[in-house]
Amino acid sequence: MNNIFNSPLEMGVRMVYLLLSLYPRKVDLQKLVYLEYAAVYSEDLGGPTSLHTPVPMRGGEHISKRDIIERGLHLMSARSFIDVTYDSTGIYYSAGENGPALVGLIGGTYASQLLMSCEWVARNFGDFGINELLFLFDKKSLTWGAEFSPLEVKGN
């Protein structure tokens, strides 16, 4: 792995932060893709200062993000940073028993801001269903990427 940016490792660590903030909720991949955007570009949704520079057409960076997030979740689940459960309605992710230890080991300004942003996302959008998130982001006229298919999701 030559580049840590936008890698499964970076996405996996970000998912640990997000899932710890959402705990004890269990969420599916599609919801995590939305919530990850909300955590990184929180200012777009009326939240704290965005973690990353809100460049024009930033939705284009999400074209392959869903796959990277999924690989990051797999990477983090192999070490119990993230738990994976499934039932007849789908696959769900939640904070794993080793998640708090990982977050506790990572220091620095970015990590503190990431935690603050993830906690804001959890408070404001953690209980939203997928259709509520679709409506919110459509209403805000955000430029999303190709990973958000026009698939209609029933329920959450």
What spans do the regions from the language model cover?
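Intrinsically disordered, low-complexity, basic-enriched segments
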Residues: 4-6, 10-11, 45, 59, ...
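Amphipathic alpha-helical interaction segments
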Residues: 42-46, 80-83, 106
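Generic structural signal for hydrophobic core residues of well-folded globular domains
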Residues: 19-23, 39, 76, 106, ...
